[in-house]
Amino acid sequence: MPALRPALLWALLALWLCWAAPAHALQCRDGYEPCVNKGMCVTYHSGTGYCKCPEGFLGEYCQHRDPCEKNRCQNGGTCVAQAMLGKATCRCASGFTGEDCQYSTPHPCFVSRPCLNGGTCHMLSRDTYECTCQVGFTGKECQWTDACLSHLCANGSTCTTVANQFSCKCLTGFTGQKCETDVNECDIPGHCQHGGTCLNLPGSYQCQCLQGFTGQYCDRLYVPCAHSPCVNGGTCRQTGDFTFECNCLPETVRNKRNRALGKRQASLEWKRTR
């Protein structure tokens, strides 16, 4: 069999592609609607079809929202939709660059890329910028390692970074580089008055008062009925320098007796049923 010439092979290949293409292309048929989002299937003379999409949709089957519907391109940039992918890019006007055309060409964010260690540069004005640093870095240009990550401040204190150094702001009652040391307030005399004893606590202290005195610093005389210790309308009566008794309302006494009687009867009933 004689060998086929290259030109004939190309012609046969092209003919095959023409016949085979409709089998793989979009088909508009009765009872079959390939287009979504109210797209309309339109048939070519060759028998193949395409989806005519309504405003706001694109893609082979109108399956994508138009990414240019909300144009994010700044400074006069033009939004260019990639229909098959449902994505968009910005074609920037002269003098601007960036994914959204947000940078002027000579802006530091674009020219010198000042934000280090993966930081993101944000343009504040034509000549100024601000860096948003990745976790673990700090500084105007994210040039410092965040020392607070490796130096934890203790006892609820707050860590701040200055350059590549850390500083702990301690809560009252603690001291030390990392606020790890409890301040013993009892080392300073005079906290507790009238012979009260100072008891050191973590981050604080407490005064244990002598009989006859009360208050945070044992600075007030103890009056038994001063703080109205009796509840449910009872009346406090001082019986001594440091003692008192409560005179309860009759209804309160009766309720207590009834509750006690009820508990006793319930106990007897329970014993009878055993």
Swiss-Prot record:
Residues 26-63, 64-102, 105-143, 144-180, 182-219, 221-258 form the EGF-like domain. SUPFAM superfamilies: EGF/Laminin. Residues 1-25 form the signal peptide. Keywords: Calcium, Disulfide bond, EGF-like domain, Repeat, Signal. GO terms for molecular function: calcium ion binding. PROSITE patterns: ASX_HYDROXYL, EGF_1, EGF_2, EGF_3, EGF_CA. Belongs to the NOTCH family. This is Notch homolog 2 N-terminal-like protein R. It comes from Homo sapiens. The lineage of its organism: Eukaryota, Metazoa, Chordata, Craniata, Vertebrata. The gene is NOTCH2NLR.
